Design a protein with these regions (language model features):
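Acidic low-complexity segments
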Residues: 1-55, 87-130, 245-247
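Short, structured patches in soluble enzyme cores that scaffold and shape functional sites
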Residues: 37, 65-69, 127-129, 140, ...
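Extended active-site and interfacial segments that coordinate phosphate-rich ligands
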Residues: 60, 77-92, 142-151, 220-233
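Short helix/loop capping segments that flank catalytic or ligand/cofactor-binding pockets
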Residues: 54, 73-77, 134-137, 144-148, ...
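Conduit-forming functional cores of very large proteins
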Residues: 66-68, 129, 145, 174, ...
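Dual-mode signal for accessory low-complexity, basic/Gly-rich regions
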Residues: 18, 155-250
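Gly/Pro-rich turn-and-neighbor structural signature
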Residues: 9, 123-141, 149, 154-156
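Short beta-strand elements
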Residues: 52-84, 205-208
Length: 250
């Protein structure tokens, strides 16, 4: 990460300005503006002489406005709930138009609470980015976690319908479905230069033309070295990542 951190006063002034701008109508009953900044330093030292230090600065701005009318309450957010979480500095907020968004989100909240309910029935649906992200997260992200595939998460967060023999031929979706995991993109939340085993980051195809090819994450534990090692060799997997050193690899 590069650049200097803005002083707290600048953050407070920005948040107060957006909060004030959201109060446009008596039907606006709740609003919030926030910026969470996380700093982390990871250092990996190996017995083979490796020494890698990586520094991260993660920005999580949030803006939400709730409107109430005729017994109904609806909430509108900027880019979805937790929809903005990237590495970087104040440029992340500028990229998503945070400054000046308070009034717009409030207007959208009013439009939402006054809009008629969606009609019932079977029809085509166009997914907005925040819903598309959730769909990918649940339908592809979690099922391709190796700890779930191996059954280690069954008592915590569940298992997966994916089994090791599916890789290389299982049709996950239509030929239009292409999904990659690319930790080399500098701005993304899950980006890194080297993973927690010292493997250099690289772009990996998860699903290509609808066919399942690879896990989105890599996983290694000494307690499971034999069975995980066999699967990793089968899939051509190297490396491992985890959310923090309070957790096992995921």
């Amino acid at each position: 990460v590069d650049g200097q951190e803005p002083p707290p006063r600048d953050w407070y002034e920005l948040l107060m300005a957006e909060s004030t701008a959201a109060a446009i109508d008596p039907r606006i009953v709740d609003w919030s503006a926030s910026v969470e900044v996380r700093h982390a330093t990871h250092r990996l030292v190996t017995s083979e002489g490796g020494d890698v230090e990586q520094r991260y600065r993660i920005m999580l701005p949030g803006l939400a406005v709730s409107a109430h009318a005729d017994g109904d309450t609806q909430t509108r957010t900027l880019n979805g709930y937790r929809g903005i979480c990237q590495q970087g500095g104040p440029e992340v907020l500028a990229r998503f138009g945070f400054a000046g968004a308070g009034r717009r989100v409030a207007e959208e909240a009013l439009e939402l609470v006054l809009a008629p309910n969606c009609p019932a029935g079977r029809m085509d649906v166009l997914l907005a980015p925040d819903q598309m992200v959730l769909q990918i997260h649940e339908s592809i992200g979690h099922p391709l976690e190796l700890d779930r595939i191996l059954g280690d998460e069954r008592n915590f967060a569940g298992t997966s319908f994916v089994t090791p023999d599916m890789f290389g031929h299982y049709r996950y979706g239509s030929e239009l479905l292409n999904v990659t995991f690319d930790p080399t993109r500098p701005e993304e939340l899950a980006s890194y230069g080297y993973d927690d085993e010292g493997t250099r980051a690289e772009r990996t195809w998860l699903i290509r033309r609808g066919i399942l090819e690879h896990l989105w994450e890599d996983f290694f534990r000494l307690t499971d070295a034999n069975r995980v090692g066999v699967l990793c060799n089968f899939l051509g997997i190297e490396g491992g990542v985890r959310p923090s050193h309070e957790h096992r690899y995921t």
